[in-house]
């Protein structure tokens, strides 16, 4: 790979490591710190199931790659595993030296490797017999015949036993078993009786380990260790498939996801080598699928950790605000007819968008509602409102993206439900994903004359649950050109060819040419002796062509600030990028908005929309970006970007070695914390 770019996957690991570092921040509530370990672990699980699984398929020749590509993929998997192993040491250090002592300060004691205290032994024994033992099903393992299938992302206990009384030379003396932990029946974390001021917790696997003699009478327990398998979860759809074929392929491949190829075998690193060798042979594990872990695996379960001590400082998040100008008795339609409206979630309530749809259901002059669906909540209020609109006589069209990873089943189910209610469903386009987050409400009077219509363009999904967790922005506008552009976009999704977009920037049509024009203009301004300025906020920056344009702008003297949460393949601080700074923000909410600023010689141009600057977004997806035309809303976005660039508590610089460099020494509560500062900024505007 060209050394002018960071490797995508190594850059992502740098981001995930930044997530882990939140667990060290002692200014945060303890259980919020614990939750960041859970997020880190969950992120890593998905990374292996998608990215590493793809590289492994290439490296093993499963994807019919040439020898050089296979070798490159194999080397990358090795590099990934080395970095993950390094991060494991940090995760263990933070958990054991920071989190567990902090829990103890609050009188919450985790039984770890040490034995259970005498005053809890009877409870642990009886709890095991009554609550756990009935759900255990030990399965013997042999090298010659594997009679157990290890399910994806399930925790197993591997046990080595010695048959009592068997001579040392007996081939049956040493036996191996595996057991799936039954925490669909029993919680992962068990609360033990309180003693004095102290609360006690125990992992379910540690309770099982303490009672192996009950499970295996007639055997001496040699040792036991946790293991887990991660399986390839990517779904590849034939680009040439038509709509009905896409539906069938998705249905079949979602079912096969649970039995996908192994991409990671995680094991307790304390396991003896001969024990590990036996399991590797028995389960036909490739050596490079081996990833050592801690004693306790599946640390994403920490999000379910009980908090028995109510005196522990709770996690307090800013509560979503409702704008007084959008009181439920007021019409969003009437407001937007007068002035564009910009909402920022989760600081503003997502109920405003639901209210917008609800008003469309009941407004007699509304004839049609059009929406894209990428990810929606289960039992979605958005979907239920659209169904109500169809039942109320409105024409409703929903584009459903079946290829939204891990949401395929939910999208299929909601599509079938909407179709049964009379909604016109458009399914995935062959060879493309539709990632745009847009909605359009069209009004006509009884005579068919067109009235004002309403467009909504967002950076986030129409999902009321993630709208409380992800930081996104969305624009309501009645601008007739934008409304007409959005109508053309929906026509394109229905098969119309050669659309023309005047204001909207749409990937695969006019987005790349317009981005190049905007960058060229900043370069030209700089050459004229004026100050070129670019600020780009996004989730990921990976496309080499656009990175090269930013390098070119930097070399011309354009000042560039990038606010990139995740993947960033651009290398700052080089001779070709000395005017580029990369800021990464990780805090309570997941930074998800895409907002772009071009200085334009003092008359700034601002945009928001759905795409990151990745190859897939810019060239293989339908994405929508809107200009912000209202001066007040422009200033609001400028202020948001300024606050984020001023963050000294949760923002760091990404340096030329992919290290997360704090902007100031931490912790300092008086420093700007952008998410909370922006919340206060918006609250003052209510």
Regions found by a protein language model. Give the residues of each.
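Short alpha-helical
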Residues: 274, 544-545
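Polyanion-binding catalytic cores of nucleic-acid enzymes and NTP/SAM-utilizing transferases
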Residues: 546, 550-552
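Hydrophobic alpha/beta core scaffold segments
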Residues: 559-563
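N-terminal localization/anchoring segments of enzymes in phospholipid and broader phosphate metabolism
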Residues: 1-534, 552, 556, 568-686
């Amino acid at each position: 790979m060209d050394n002018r770019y960071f490797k995508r996957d190594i850059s992502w690991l740098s981001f995930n490591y930044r997530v882990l570092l939140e667990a060290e921040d002692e200014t945060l509530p303890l259980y919020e710190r614990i939750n960041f370990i859970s997020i880190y672990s969950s992120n890593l699980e998905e990374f292996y199931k998608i990215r590493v699984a793809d590289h492994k398929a290439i490296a093993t020749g499963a994807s019919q790659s040439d020898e050089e590509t296979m070798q490159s993929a194999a080397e990358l998997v090795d590099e990934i595993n080395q970095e993950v192993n390094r991060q494991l040491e940090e995760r263990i250090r933070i958990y054991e030296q920071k989190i567990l002592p902090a829990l103890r300060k609050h009188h919450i004691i985790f039984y770890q490797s040490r034995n259970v205290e005498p005053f809890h032994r009877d409870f642990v024994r009886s709890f095991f017999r009554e609550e756990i033992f009935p759900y255990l099903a030990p399965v013997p393992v042999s090298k010659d015949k594997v009679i157990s299938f290890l399910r994806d992302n399930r925790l197993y206990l591997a046990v080595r036993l010695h048959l009592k009384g068997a001579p040392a030379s007996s081939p049956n003396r040493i036996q191996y078993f595996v057991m799936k932990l039954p925490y669909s029946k029993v919680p992962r974390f068990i609360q033990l009786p309180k003693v004095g001021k102290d609360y006690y917790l125990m992992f379910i696997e540690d309770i099982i380990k303490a009672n192996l003699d009950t499970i295996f009478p007639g055997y001496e327990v040699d040792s036991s260790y946790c293991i887990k398998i991660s399986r390839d979860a990517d779904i590849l759809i034939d680009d040439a498939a038509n709509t009905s074929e896409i539906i069938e392929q998705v249905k079949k491949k979602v079912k096969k996801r649970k039995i996908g190829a192994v991409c990671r075998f995680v094991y307790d690193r304390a396991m003896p080598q001969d024990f590990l060798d036996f399991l590797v042979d028995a389960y036909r594990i490739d050596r490079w699928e081996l990833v050592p872990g801690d004693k306790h695996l599946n640390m994403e379960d920490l999000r379910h950790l009980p908090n028995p001590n109510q005196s522990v400082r709770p996690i307090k998040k800013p509560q979503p605000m409702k704008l007084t100008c959008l009181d439920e008795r007021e019409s969003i339609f009437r407001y937007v007819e007068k002035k564009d409206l910009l909402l920022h979630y989760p600081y503003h309530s997502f109920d405003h968008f639901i209210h917008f749809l609800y008003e469309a259901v009941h407004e007699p002059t509304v004839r049609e509602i059009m929406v894209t669906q990428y990810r929606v909540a289960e039992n979605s209020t958005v979907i239920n409102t659209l169904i109500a609109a169809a039942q109320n006589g409105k024409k409703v069209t929903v584009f459903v993206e079946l290829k939204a990873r891990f949401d395929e089943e939910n999208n299929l189910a909601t599509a079938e439900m909407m179709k049964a209610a009379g909604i016109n469903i458009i399914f995935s386009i062959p060879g493309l994903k539709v990632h745009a987050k847009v909605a359009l409400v069209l009004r006509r009077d009884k005579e068919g004359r067109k009235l004002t219509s309403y467009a909504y363009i967002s950076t986030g999904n129409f999902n009321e649950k993630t709208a409380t967790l992800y930081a996104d922005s969305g624009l309501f506008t009645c601008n007739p050109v934008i409304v007409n552009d959005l109508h053309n976009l929906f026509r394109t999704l229905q098969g119309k060819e050669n659309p023309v977009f005047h204001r909207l920037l749409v990937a695969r049509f006019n987005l790349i040419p317009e981005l190049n024009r905007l960058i060229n203009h900043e370069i030209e301004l700089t050459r004229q002796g004026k100050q070129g300025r670019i600020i780009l906020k996004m989730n990921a920056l990976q496309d080499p062509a656009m990175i090269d344009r930013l390098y070119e702008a930097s070399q011309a003297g354009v000042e560039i600030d990038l606010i990139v949460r995740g993947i960033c393949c651009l290398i700052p601080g080089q001779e070709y990028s000395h005017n580029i700074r990369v800021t990464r923000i990780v805090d309570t909410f997941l930074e998800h908005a895409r907002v772009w600023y071009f200085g334009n010689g003092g008359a700034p141009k601002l945009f928001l929309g759905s795409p990151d600057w990745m190859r897939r977004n810019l060239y293989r997806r339908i994405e929508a970006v809107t200009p912000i035309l209202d001066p007040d809303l422009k200033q609001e976005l400028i202020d948001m970007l300024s606050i984020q660039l001023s963050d000294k508590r949760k923002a760091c610089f990404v340096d030329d070695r992919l290290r997360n460099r704090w902007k100031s020494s931490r912790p300092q509560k008086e420093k700007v914390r952008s998410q909370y500062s922006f919340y206060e900024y918006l609250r003052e505007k209510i």
